[in-house]
């Protein structure tokens, strides 16, 4: 009962940032957990009672953004939403390479001073921890892009390079969008599907070519087309296309691990919305699926609660 009362007081104070509130909140220890992509970042503020408050900011990617741009996001968007005595930060993000971890840690310490623990890792380790916990397994990201790894329960021990949507990225939303457009305009799919797609999206072949070849972020545009495929799952050719798309992912990205004994788990919108076809592809290639999650954040909250 006392914990419930403390929780309600905490929620009330988070909304009213007065001097008394700040004094009280300094006694509440918090963890801050982030799952960051290039377009948005999902944050979870977790208190001692294991209550989570979910926050959002725009995306962060140290590969594409300057320190000044990222600090502005931290300072202007994240900081006003924070409350409590944050002692630990666990950040998982796209574009985080080993040579950029120190830069991200420094920026976070400027925004959240006095941290006892700070971890900055790539999104693939975040996916592995969310999907496998502390167990051995194969973890995958199937969203706009695709990635995978062999995880030993503590660290990533192997990674097949995805190579991006031009050279690879089998299983991704971007490559699925390419295959869908190809099938629409080369007569593999019916005129009925093509006409319905053009009517519902307002896109023509010339408009698609303009977006892909003459405008930036073609991968995101192509991935956005993949969501429309869900409307045509009653068509056998669409289902075959999807299953083959995922089979290529297993053949080119998962087979090099030589671990058919391990479950293959995946996070991301493509894995989540096309689970049935992903399951069919896994079965055909001799793999068993494990967990499928749309987002890793809630599983990461559970992972760090038990640390």
Predicted region positions:
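Cofactor-binding loop segments of dinucleotide-utilizing enzymes, especially the Rossmann-like FAD-
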Residues: 94, 123, 269
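Polybasic, low-complexity association/targeting segments
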Residues: 90-97
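Cysteine-centered motifs
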Residues: 14, 18-21
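Phosphate-binding/catalytic loop of phosphoryl-transfer enzymes
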Residues: 97-189
């Amino acid at each position: 009962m006392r914990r419930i009362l403390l929780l309600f007081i905490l929620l009330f104070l988070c909304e009213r940032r007065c001097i008394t509130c700040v004094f009280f909140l300094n006694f509440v220890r918090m963890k801050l957990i982030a799952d960051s992509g290039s377009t948005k970042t999902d944050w979870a503020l977790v208190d001692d009672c294991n209550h989570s408050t979910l926050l959002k900011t725009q995306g962060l990617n140290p590969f594409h953004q300057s320190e000044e741009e990222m600090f502005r996001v931290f300072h202007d968007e994240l900081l006003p939403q924070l409350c409590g005595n944050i002692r630990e930060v666990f950040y998982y993000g796209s574009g985080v390479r080993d040579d950029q971890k120190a830069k991200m840690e420094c920026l976070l310490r400027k925004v959240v001073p006095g941290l006892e623990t700070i971890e900055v890792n790539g999104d693939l380790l975040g996916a592995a921890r969310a999907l496998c916990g502390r167990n051995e397994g194969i973890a995958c990201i199937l969203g706009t892009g695709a990635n995978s790894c062999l995880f030993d329960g503590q660290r990533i021990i192997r990674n097949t390079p995805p190579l991006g949507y031009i050279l690879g990225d089998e299983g991704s939303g971007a490559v699925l969008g390419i295959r869908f457009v190809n099938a629409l305009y080369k007569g593999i799919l019916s005129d009925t599907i093509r006409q319905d797609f053009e009517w519902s999206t307002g896109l023509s072949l010339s408009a698609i070519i303009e977006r892909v070849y003459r405008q930036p972020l073609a991968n995101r545009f192509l991935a956005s087309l993949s969501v429309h495929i869900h409307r045509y799952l009653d068509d056998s050719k669409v289902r075959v296309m999807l299953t083959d798309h995922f089979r290529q992912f297993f053949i080119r990205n998962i087979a090099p691990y030589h671990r058919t004994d391990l479950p293959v788990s995946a996070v991301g919108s493509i894995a989540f919305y096309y689970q049935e076809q992903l399951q069919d592809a896994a079965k055909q290639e001799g793999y068993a699926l494990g967990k499928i999650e749309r987002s890793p954040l809630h599983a990461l909250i559970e992972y760090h609660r038990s640390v």
